[in-house]
């Protein structure tokens, strides 16, 4: 288990922003990482663009399209991370799809991710039953394969939690990523089941966009994950998005702190 991921949750409730690498450009992505860290982010999720991101709603899908048409490749993302690692040690995890890893070569991808300084990997389209081939290689190279747990049966939550590493990504609602007006899932109940099975941090994502929602979710867990709302700011402001994202992340981290 990556100690850096554990540390991200050791300072109180964590705020975890997500951005798509290369939207609007890899140079801006790099600047966003530094700005979000300054604004109080505890761990950063970096999305490696993929042509068919099944777990994503329209906002992140469009960001993937923009990044890919801008020429972003997995290798360019690795180079960017290596550059970021010269300036900051903030915990970072990749979020991408099995196909991105397969087409690069599973071991090659995971080894390279570890070499450039990533701490973990989230593969939303890989079900629990199929994670073994990735998990084994991740363990070999010291990368945490982060498990997602959606609203499901107590038994399944327990089964997934027992084998989880790093932190557990609790999915607040079934369906794709995006902003929701209301989150009705019993997050507190889900977190209790996870903690009963394993002593591991739980962060909640999918559908959080306002400070109020972030505070409410963090109150029932160890942190809040926000993607679409940040990606929307990148889409709206393009090359000038950094100060807007920084201000937003600060407001979200402040809310999470109060939880």
Regions found by a protein language model. Name each.
Residues 1-19, 80-86:
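N-terminal amphipathic alpha-helix/helix-capping segment at the start of soluble metabolic enzymes
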Residues 15-19, 44-46, 92-96, 121-123, ...:
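Hydrophobic faces of well-ordered beta-strands that scaffold small-molecule active sites
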Residues 26-36, 152-162, 204, 208-224:
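Catalytic cores of alpha/beta
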Residues 37, 48, 61-123, 256:
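Active-site beta->alpha loop and helix N-cap motifs at the rims of alpha/beta catalytic domains
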Residues 41-52, 118-122, 127, 172-179, ...:
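Glycine-rich phosphate-binding active-site loops on the catalytic face of alpha/beta enzymes
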Residues 60-62, 70, 158-196, 233-235:
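Glycine/Thr-rich beta-alpha phosphate-binding loop at enzyme active sites
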Residues 69-72, 117-130, 144-152, 158, ...:
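Catalytic beta/alpha-barrel core
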Residues 77, 192-200, 209-215, 219-259:
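Alpha/beta catalytic cores of nucleotide-metabolism and tRNA/nucleoside-modifying enzymes
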